[in-house]
Amino acid sequence: MQFIDYVKIYVKAGDGGRGCISFRREKYVPKGGPDGGDGGKGGDVIIQASSELHTLLDHRYQKVYKAQRGQHGKGSNMKGKDGENLIIKVPVGTVVKDAETEEVLADLDEEEKYFIVAKGGRGGFGNAHFATPTNQAPRYAQPGEKGQERWVILELKLLADVGLIGLPNAGKSTLISVISSAKPKIADYPFTTLIPVLGVVKYENYQSFVVADIPGLIEGAHKGAGLGHQFLRHVERTSLLLHLVDVSDFSESDPREDFEKIQKELELYNPALTKKPFAVVGTKIDIAYKGDRLGKLKKYCEEKGIDFFPISAVKKEGIDKLLHYLSEKVGKKCGLL
């Protein structure tokens, strides 16, 4: 299934039904008064969160959503039937924005949470509504009001406790496949992960938590380079970030610079991301034979007071210690421990 996390749609609420112009015409009521009924209200367009959905794929192909209009009023004071509301289901974690101003209209971060994105028009009054002592036979009724319409942006931000970030091929996919039941594509080339992957982690007697594997970031990601900022939004909701840095002998870059590049991209995208609790994970220690890169990164983290965990996901070295740390941190953050 394709992962779509950003779409633009048009919504139109139902118009109100028009009021009716009618008069009583009964055999023994020669001067029957007005009896035109009111028009029905137009249906609202409602966007509602559902845990059954995990992507905005459906809305990529259907861009226009219109609610039912209200029916017109009838004689004998019969009110027109209200139009049915149109409910648009989206994944939990979807943010609704005005397409023109980009103002956040709603953050649907809970199951069944909803937002009325376009309100239906009021039905028009029938002529019975306008009868007065001086005008007992009004030949006027109101038209229904127009329903609201607008373009909106639906933006999905995944709900995860821990976000795995790092340069391409840092070992994020391997780690999440070891600590959870998630099975992302794994290979020894950059950008293997093209979409965010979620995995549920259960460690000993701790509460389970959700980890998100975010596609690899590169310099300029905040401007859209590489897979770009389209996936940076998914780390905004996390409680804790894990910076994964390749410390193997096969990587030629300075591990300290690798870490700082990602920190810079986070700050340029959203400075609040650098304020989140985080730890650094040195990956692939099973092929860090010389230990130079591992030593540099470990010393750097010690000097900066950063929690550091050297691991080998392939050989499961250091994994237990890392999971214990994550379980305690996420548990405390969620108030579970």
Curated annotation (Swiss-Prot):
* GO CC annotation, single: cytoplasm
Every copy of the OBG-type G domain together lies at 160-331
Q: Quote the record's binding site residues for GTP.
A: 166-173, 191-195, 213-216, 283-286, 312-314
Q: Where in the cell is it found?
A: Cytoplasm
Q: Which GO terms describe its biological process?
A: ribosome biogenesis
Name the coenzymes or cofactors required.
Answer: Mg(2+)
The enzyme's first-digit EC class, named in words, is hydrolase
Q: Does the keyword DNA repair apply?
A: no
Q: Which residues bind Mg(2+)?
A: 173, 193
The UniProt entry, under InterPro entries, shows: G_OBG, GTP-bd, GTP-bd_Obg/CgtA, GTP1-OBG_CS, GTP1_OBG_dom, GTP1_OBG_dom_sf, OBG_GTPase, P-loop_NTPase
Ranges of residues in domain Obg: 1-159
Q: Which UniProt keywords apply?
A: Cytoplasm, GTP-binding, Hydrolase, Magnesium, Metal-binding, Nucleotide-binding
Query: What does the UniProt function comment say about this protein?
Result: An essential GTPase which binds GTP, GDP and possibly (p)ppGpp with moderate affinity, with high nucleotide exchange rates and a fairly low GTP hydrolysis rate. Plays a role in control of the cell cycle, stress response, ribosome biogenesis and in those bacteria that undergo differentiation, in morphogenesis control.
Q: How does it assemble?
A: Monomer.
Listed HAMAP family = GTPase_Obg
Looking up NCBIfam families in the UniProt record yields: Obg_CgtA, PRK12296.1, PRK12297.1, PRK12299.1, small_GTP
> What family does this chain come from, according to its entry?
Belongs to the TRAFAC class OBG-HflX-like GTPase superfamily. OBG GTPase family.
Please report the name of this protein according to its UniProt entry.
Answer: GTPase Obg
**Organism of origin:** Thermodesulfovibrio yellowstonii (strain ATCC 51303 / DSM 11347 / YP87)
Gene that this polypeptide is encoded by = obg
